[in-house]
Amino acid sequence: MTLTRRRFAGVLLGAGAALAAPVRAWARKPKASPAAHYEKLRSGAVVCRLCPHECRVGPGRRGLCGVRENRGGKYYTLVYGQPCSLHVDPIEKKPLFHYLPGSQALSLATAGCNFSCRFCQNWEISQRRPEELDAIDLPPQAVVRLARQRRCPVIAHTYSEPVVFFEYVRDCAALGREQGVPNVMISNGFIQKEPLRELCRHLGAVKIDLKAFGEPFYREQCGGALKPVLDTLLTVRAEKPWLEVVV
């Protein structure tokens, strides 16, 4: 699912994309943007409150996902506006079967994941750090514009794990909602309630991969836990975006 610089250029040129912001491929030097949902500690460490791992991250270190870094006691995301995978897919490929059926979805992902599934289909990007992959500068405004140019009525955050590029999903979804291009999130559901509720205010649909029905499987095969995922299902249902579950 990784894209080389040449393939990225082909996608964008094929779209006839005249983006207002310049599009540049980069590797090895991810840009830092302020992260949301974390707590500062007196020691200079931070505690990430984005997902149930609640990583305690010392200065100069990263969380388990590999895409969020403590710099001088402040937490930053290293993947904001910097997708490493970009494609146009049928929405059923997500899979979402009952939300805008028959539509083409502008689909994107960044590096990183908060799970380490032994059976991951997209491990080439989900289990990599951002500096290990080529990516492009594609801010939310450009994402929505590109979706319109490609005549995609929906934007899908997919392939890796949208939870770890929370800020990018949030801003794309908010802008897309304003401009009539809904966003959907294809997720493992391993996220804290507060950031999930924030996303649900903007998302058109959420699809959760329910990988198993037991804690041992989640712990041993995914590096996560089942209970927070079940809590996510209840929260999404209560917040009212369209919800689909794939087992």
State each model region's role.
Residues 135, 220-228:
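Alpha-helix N-cap and loop-to-helix initiation/capping positions
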Residues 22-57:
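C-terminal segment of N-terminal export signals and the immediately downstream linker at the start
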Residues 227-247:
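Conserved C-terminal portion of the radical SAM core fold
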Residues 46-67, 111-123:
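Local cysteine-cluster metal-coordination motifs and their immediate loop/turn environment
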Residues 70-205, 214:
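Conserved Radical SAM active-site core
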Residues 16-22:
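Hydrophobic h-region of N-terminal signal peptides that target proteins for export
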Residues 1-15:
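N-terminal secretory signal peptides and thylakoid transit peptides that target proteins
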